[in-house]
Amino acid sequence: MSVIKHKAQRVGVFIDTQNLYHSAKNLYRSKVNFNNVLKDAVADRNLVRAIAYVVNTESGEEQGFFEALAKIGIETKTKDLQIFFGGAKKADWDVGMAIDAVKMAPKLDAVILATGDGDFVPAVEHLKTAGGCQVEVIAFGRSSSGRLKEVVDEFIDMDENPKRYTIGAVPAAKTRGAARGATRAKGTGDAWGTVKRLA
């Protein structure tokens, strides 16, 4: 679908960091180049706000990553990793990210979600109908929900240029499990490591 993009258009970018991180890790054994994700999401329009939803791990080694995001103009909202009896871990920002997008929609012309998670389909439908916003998604197509791709006004497939959207990309074996693993791994709480370079 063709979308309208112009310099005066007000955009908000909402980044599901866990989803992109695990997709890049499982598909390309690499890290995400958030600088290029942000540039291509904004596309020379008027950025109102960019927020990355992130998880604090037990080790705390993600602090350098948070600082790197701040340097390129991305705010972070953090949540502690929950560890349940038996060792199960959970770190899920889906509801918080969707609520922020809905709350900010009246101040935006376009909402850009950086995620491939199909849980956002109801939020996308609400933003388009009740919010009157153009809704775009930027994510790795191989690990993205087919339904999410269908309901958005534009889907930017990061798999079409993995070198642009990853740092240290090495294509993983093209198996059916690679794409499923990216989605399944979401929220497992693996350590982020530090981002050495975003540009």
Show which residues each predicted segment covers.
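Terminal and domain-boundary accessory regions
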Residues: 1-199
